[in-house]
Amino acid sequence: MPETEKPLFGHPWIFIRGVPSLNFLPPEGPPEVAFAGRSNVGKSSLINALVSQKGLARTSNTPGRTQELNYFVPDGYSGEAGDLPPMAIVDMPGYGYAQAPKEQVDKWTKLVFDYLRGRATLKRVYVLIDSRHGIKKNDDDVLDLLDKAAVSYQLVLTKTDKIKAPAVPKLLAETADKIRKRPAAYPYLLSTSSEKGDGLDELRQAIAETVGIANWK
């Protein structure tokens, strides 16, 4: 199969770099999607489940551990001109950790806002919401940031296996109503469970459509 026809989620992904400041960003090239969410929302687990690789994104029981923008791309590309990966997934630092020092929070906010505002190749941010807790104030603050930066974002419920199945459609409807008037919000929400695999294909397809890739599995 030619390199350009590799299914997006049908072969391994690799970590290429952590970005502690904008100086370390890779050159703009392939389209990017980013994942944002509160500490311990299940962000790393969801990225690992998406690409079917348990150890790709580091998971931790320590909230606030990830303090960089972590870049992941499909393997098999040199990264040189003419052989770039088709897209990148960016794992953003978790937010909302109550014990994080103010200096750390300020640094995170500046890094994220500068990235959001200035990254032309960023196509969408997937904001993860823990289905057990719904939208919290920290989430609203980040949605405000995204609206201000005029970056398209889509909400994704995580850990739906932790709530009763009949509650999921109601939660989706309630959450959609809460963001209905937000200017940068994509109106269609997704629900996922990394543990059970629920909703992963829908999220894979959404990502592929966002970056303009037809062959995703």
UniProtKB/Swiss-Prot annotation:
GO terms for cellular component: cytosol. GO terms for biological process: division septum assembly. Disulfide bonds: none annotated. Mg(2+) binds at residues 44, 66. Keywords: Cell cycle, Cell division, GTP-binding, Magnesium, Metal-binding, Nucleotide-binding, Septation. Pfam families: MMR_HSR1. One of its GO terms (molecular function) is metal ion binding. Its cofactor is Mg(2+). Residues 29-213 form the EngB-type G domain. The keyword Metal-binding applies. GTP binds at residues 37-44, 64-68, 91-94, 158-161, 192-194. The keyword Magnesium applies. InterPro entries: G_ENGB_dom, GTP-bd, GTP-bd_ribosome_bio_YsxC, P-loop_NTPase. PANTHER family: ENGB-TYPE G DOMAIN-CONTAINING PROTEIN, MSS1/TRME-RELATED GTP-BINDING PROTEIN. NCBIfam families: GTPase_YsxC. Necessary for normal cell division and for the maintenance of normal septation. Belongs to the TRAFAC class TrmE-Era-EngA-EngB-Septin-like GTPase superfamily. EngB GTPase family. This is Probable GTP-binding protein EngB. The lineage of its organism: Bacteria, Pseudomonadati, Pseudomonadota, Alphaproteobacteria, Hyphomicrobiales. The gene is engB.
